[in-house]
Amino acid sequence: MGTLRADEISNIIRERIEQYNREVKIVNTGTVLQVGDGIARIHGLDEVMAGELIEFEEGTIGIALNLESNNVGVVLMGDGLMIKEGSSVKATGRIAQIPVSEAFLGRVINALAKPIDGRGEISSSESRLIESPAPGIISRRSVYEPLQTGLIAIDSMIPIGRGQRELIIGDRQTGKTAVATDTILNQKGQNVICVYVAIGQKASSVAQVVTTFQEGGAMEYTIVVAETADSPATLQYLAPYTGAALAEYFMYRERHTSIIYDDLSKQAQAYRQMSLLLRRPPGREAYPGDVFYLHSRLLERAAKLSSRLGEGSMTALPIVETQSGDVSAYIPTNVISITDGQIFLSADLFNAGIRPAINVGISVSRVGSAAQIKAMKQVAGKSKLELAQFAELEAFAQFASDLDKATQNQLARGQRLRELLKQSQSDPLAVEDQIATIYTGTNGYLDALEIGQVKKFLVGLRTYLTKKKPKFQEILSSTKIFTEEAETLLREAIQEQIELFLLQEQT
């Protein structure tokens, strides 16, 4: 048996001491006191930060929302069925963030930016905080470029600009989502990245929207963030912030983006559920006191950036659902006060066959004509006033037995104006076609036609202009001004098309 010499032993010990790497890792831990309804109460976690991500023993992630003297209230980003009372928990030292990249375009993801469309993982090298601060005053500039929705009623009377926040509000089943999806379809070829956030909707409704985008060729510039009705409240609450983080990524890269939140009523309900389960004091309609801040910090992230930051933009179109047309409820009034205008959709108009069912009288854009091209301002300037006067006159005329000729003419003109605003779903119009349509109506060219013939005539006129008078569209797209030459070309086309149309109708 060999003997070890004392100097060998000391050398081995010295080597071991030199190799010893003393690494102390401090982990902030806690113990689950109670779990249920998507909420966990944790004892310990003394150093935890508000909004910090918490990791449970079995892998579920949560967010620390309530920091109380003797426990921490954590909302779970998952069902948490495997979490047991007494199991250990650790703080991660991170706050919620998601990966971001160009590869997200054309994909359907959840609130954690994980793909749910079965097309594999999404590669990304960057990440972005879900809750980012909104651009400051110096970082912004005023809105001046139009974001064309393709809907005549909106682009002519309630114009939306790039960087604006325009609320779409109305009862259920009045076409709110249709207005939003048509806006996305109309961005084809406009170099605008679109993000559609579905919050608490039926999975079948989301699938239908995705199919509409695919058929219209819109998925190549669109990201869909979906948390359906069966998702945990925490994820429904986070989904809009995830969408905003993705849109911001493109905005700060000098791109134009548009984001639709469908809808914020359901996000507020999810937040209310979380807050009540966390035992936060309820306020009006049982919503927590900070529900205004919930939406304001989200919508303030929409902006038109200054030239120093590259003039990118993020246009927000939040949707809010009302009950029986009550816009004075808590969430509708909150979001109306945050946004730069609202498009009000009326159930009565929808049921009367006027679609999109936009109530022009109480819809407004606080950016106004700054978000219109000059040609549209020239043509559509007086149409909103005419329609408002017509609506008033129509209500009065119901009680009058004999009306004078001027009133009858005004009513006839109003009915035709209302008719030209009707549009089929997924059929957005180019701005040149809209200008031709409005000009035809406001200048009395439709007065000779029956109301039932208006739509057919306008479709024919737009086709005729494209084929026989292409110069009209060239002038408008190049100069953005309704010049005398353009007006002459349009007048000629209308006269020729009316003669042709009346001849066809007689035969």
UniProtKB/Swiss-Prot annotation:
Catalytic activity: ATP + H2O + 4 H(+)(in) = ADP + phosphate + 5 H(+)(out)
One Pfam family from the record: ATP-synt_ab_N
Compartmental location: Plastid, Chloroplast thylakoid membrane
Annotated membrane topology: Peripheral membrane protein
GO MF: ADP binding; ATP binding; proton-transporting ATP synthase activity, rotational mechanism
Domain of life per record: Eukaryota
Keyword Translocase set for record: yes
Residues reported to bind ATP: 170-177
One GO cellular component term noted in the UniProt record for this chain: chloroplast thylakoid membrane
Principal localisation: plastid
Record has Secreted as a keyword: no
Enzyme Commission number: 7.1.2.2
Required for activity, annotated site positions: 363
PANTHER family to which the protein is assigned, alphabetical: ATP SYNTHASE SUBUNIT ALPHA, MITOCHONDRIAL
Biological role stated in the UniProt entry: Produces ATP from ADP in the presence of a proton gradient across the membrane. The alpha chain is a regulatory subunit.
HAMAP family in UniProt: ATP_synth_alpha_bact
Name recorded for this polypeptide: ATP synthase subunit alpha, chloroplastic
Species assigned in the record: Phalaenopsis aphrodite subsp. formosana (Moth orchid)
